[in-house]
Amino acid sequence: VLTYGDLVTDLKAYAADKRWRKEVGGIVVNGVPIATDDRSKQMIMGARLAAEADPNFTTPWVANDNSVHTLSAAEVIAISNAVLAHVAGCFATYATVAPQIESGAIAGAAQIDAAFG
């Protein structure tokens, strides 16, 4: 027998998985598909540190579709900012969805899917 508590736990786990999949699913910044998995986020942060230290910094970057782009310091910083905004948006959506699951306002996976877009 599935209890309400089981349903809430299952829906919260589903929402957490949905958040994670969206977070690591990648984004497009100025036409360049950017990977947002944990390794890629570390590489982006490293490039950002170099870009902040040297405004003339450039680096070849392999995009999520395997195309190669030479990025300037400003482009690296813009990509880093976009990735941060993407991740923060995923967390913000989950922070809105989780209490709605607990309150019963969200009672199914379709509502969670809709919240995450």
Model feature map: region roles:
Residues 1-117:
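A preference for well-ordered globular domain cores
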